[in-house]
């Protein structure tokens, strides 16, 4: 872990003069991703075809969706498959990310019940000046379900806060925190009992009968090194691939600490992720959790709107191995 910290500090110092305005990323699994997946399928544009890298950069998303919104207004053939509900969801996305979208009067509330809150209709707190932007929203998610023949109901009880911002027009930051109580369907409970883990969660504890309780904490900083490259240091999850689950890198695991480098050149995108993985299985005594170190590299090429070609490499160092410098070689297939 110390090596990751040293590399981050050295990189930040070396690139300090070149840092440009940088956005943070969309919340993994959020409703914005659902909308983008739909827009990619309905419009089939190359601009939205890099969604096999998640989470997505907010600034990039707003730029592309704003272009699509303009095409919809002119009834361009690209948007003929979109509905009025799609139009509404596009406006909601642009409103929620107004730090990057074009100013519109409909984004500003006529009046708010509490002074200073929901000045922007989509964000509870939206404070900004020439050097600082702060946006914060509460998180409330309550769901309950049932299944025929099962006396136990399923439920999700989630409360928390989501904060993001930009410092000095150069460093983007975000923080996401929720407290969660859940009782999942029987097959998920069986999986949990078998592997002593919950999909997407780290440390967990029992809650009532068949339920579990856990915190979901994420956060990080990001900065743009050059026009064609950005970097991120965060404690979160990543996704490389297509579909709900990926055979390359899925967000099925718990959050982990990582450094990520994205490089863009024409129709190519190259991503490197260097991360530390921690096993949260409890052994009944106080001890250091086992750790592994992992690097994922993915090169994506989008020659047409219907074809994407990718190369993937994953390197894992087991818990008995010491952290090795070749792991940080960003060139695919040359580390070991």
Predicted region positions:
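Bacterial Sec-dependent N-terminal signal peptides
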Residues: 1-24
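Outer-membrane beta-barrel domain signature
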Residues: 26, 51, 147-151, 206-209, ...
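Transmembrane beta-strand segments of Gram-negative outer membrane beta-barrel proteins
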Residues: 28-41, 94-153, 165, 169-175, ...
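Transmembrane beta-barrel architecture of outer-membrane proteins
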Residues: 119-120, 137-139, 156-160, 214-218, ...
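Outer-membrane beta-barrel strand-turn architecture
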Residues: 128, 167-169, 224-227, 264-267, ...
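Residues on the lipid-exposed face of transmembrane beta-strands in outer-membrane beta-barrel proteins
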Residues: 161-165, 219-223, 233, 259-263, ...
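Carboxylate/His-rich catalytic cores and anion/metal-binding grooves
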Residues: 161-203, 208, 304-313
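Signature for the C-terminal beta-barrel architecture of outer-membrane proteins
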Residues: 212, 238-239, 246, 250-336
């Amino acid at each position: 872990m110390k090596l990751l910290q040293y590399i981050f500090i050295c990189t930040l110092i070396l690139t300090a003069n070149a840092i440009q305005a940088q956005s943070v990323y969309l919340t993994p699994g959020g409703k914005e991703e659902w909308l983008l997946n739909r827009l990619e399928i309905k419009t089939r544009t190359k601009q939205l075809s890099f969604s096999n890298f998640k989470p997505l950069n907010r600034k990039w998303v707003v730029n592309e969706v704003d272009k699509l919104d303009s095409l919809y207004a002119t009834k361009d053939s690209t948007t003929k498959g979109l509905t009025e509900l799609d139009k509404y969801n596009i406006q909601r996305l642009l409103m929620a990310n107004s730090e990057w979208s074009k100013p519109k009067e409909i984004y500003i509330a006529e009046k708010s019940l509490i002074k200073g809150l929901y000045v922007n209709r989509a964000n509870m707190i939206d404070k900004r000046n020439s050097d600082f932007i702060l946006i914060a929203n509460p998180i409330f998610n309550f769901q309950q379900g049932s299944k025929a023949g099962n006396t136990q109901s399923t439920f999700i009880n989630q409360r928390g806060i989501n904060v993001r911002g930009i410092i000095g027009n150069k460093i983007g930051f975000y923080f996401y925190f929720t407290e969660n109580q859940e009782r999942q369907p029987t097959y998920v409970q069986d999986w949990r009992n078998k592997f002593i883990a919950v999909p997407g969660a780290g440390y967990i504890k029992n809650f009532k009968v068949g339920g579990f309780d856990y915190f979901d904490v994420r956060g990080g900083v990001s900065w743009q090194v050059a026009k064609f490259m950005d970097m991120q240091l965060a404690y979160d999850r990543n996704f490389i691939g297509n579909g709900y689950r990926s055979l390359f890198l899925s967000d099925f695991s718990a959050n982990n600490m990582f450094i990520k480098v994205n490089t863009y050149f024409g129709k190519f995108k190259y991503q490197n992720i260097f991360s530390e993985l921690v096993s949260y299985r409890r052994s009944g005594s106080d001890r250091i959790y086992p750790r592994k170190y992992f690097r994922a590299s993915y090169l994506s090429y989008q020659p047409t709107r219907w074809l994407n070609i990718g190369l993937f490499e994953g390197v894992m160092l087991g818990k008995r191995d010491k952290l090795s410098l070749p792991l940080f070689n960003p060139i695919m297939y040359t580390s070991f």
